[in-house]
């Protein structure tokens, strides 16, 4: 639903800065982005609501600043911009770049706007919306701000060109290589030709809405491992600018290549998830075990989306057997009804929780340091914590290196894809 809404919002943004052709081209560019189509339009991630609120806020930011086809400033739009920017920040912290880009633009090119009360009202509304988040993070040990700050902390770190290279290449792929080429062409076209004043305003605010986010995350990636989708919202305004230039040039053939690339990636990705038809290169083993299945599927990211139904059914069978044994032995053996599953990290704890525990009428609890369990520290406490000698299940996966002591294996489960084993799970119970 939000994916469709986002496409409509991009079309409306195109109309705002140009005409129907600009809106159509902007919608095509948005659809051609793997980040927009898959992460924002298909998956259930923080990026999903972020994308919708980001685009809505950007629409009203452009109206307020007069970066539109009629070049008229409408400062009252800052109220709506602030509302949606606040909602974007509630979805993900990167929503703050909406205000950063706008304020930088106003500081350099439209300082008189700082005297307008609508601007400050919009800023206040955004801050009001994120105040609960700020308060919770300042009073809770499981601070999300602290967690994410640690992920990008670079003091004392040596530059890692490989990490930077992965970030650049990832951004190139997430946002569609064909469209990156179109973007570069649009920038060259603008730079080499004199544009009208309203186009200058659009170009300037696009730069301030995009460059800071991309530059900051590229800088972080020089010292820490980052993910390309962190900076991907910065490309939304860049697609608008590209659409405006392509509409001016009346070019439409490049969209065949752009959408064709996305279609091919989606088709091949779906086939790979379902069949594993593309052989993946083997990475260096992390363990020295002689067990041939110790790291089965470890380096295949497509398995994140495969095999959960098989594991769920296998766990359900083990659960029924253990509960029957518990009942027959008056609690001396087996596992009590509703016994929780123990995990040591928030990932794959969240997967186990949704795909395995919930369908089988139980929950997941975690143990370990806060930086590993994160929000599941609080979730575990809400679920009653872990009691002394509490009987718990543990699921060891060949895809993850985590393990716990004092376990008694109950069953070994192989997930099959295309008649080949791709993951091994060992379902155990904690013996304490």
Question: What residues fall within each predicted segment?
Answer:
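Transmembrane alpha-helices of multi-pass, membrane-embedded glycan-processing enzymes
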Residues: 1-9, 30-33, 50-53, 238
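Transmembrane-helix motifs of polytopic, lipid-linked glycan transferases
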Residues: 2-18, 56, 60
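Short helix- or helix-capping micro-motifs
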Residues: 26-32, 85, 89
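Short acidic/glycine- and proline-prone juxtamembrane loop motifs at membrane-interface regions
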Residues: 41-49
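Specific aromatic-rich, kink-prone transmembrane helix
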Residues: 49-69, 80, 84-85, 238-241
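Transmembrane-lumen/periplasm boundary regions of multi-pass, lipid-linked membrane glycan transferases
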Residues: 87, 98-203, 209-224
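Signature aromatic-anchored transmembrane alpha helix within multi-pass, membrane-resident enzymes
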Residues: 248-285
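Aromatic/acidic, Gly/Pro-rich catalytic loop(s) in extracytoplasmic/lumenal soluble domains
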Residues: 310, 316-319, 323, 362-432
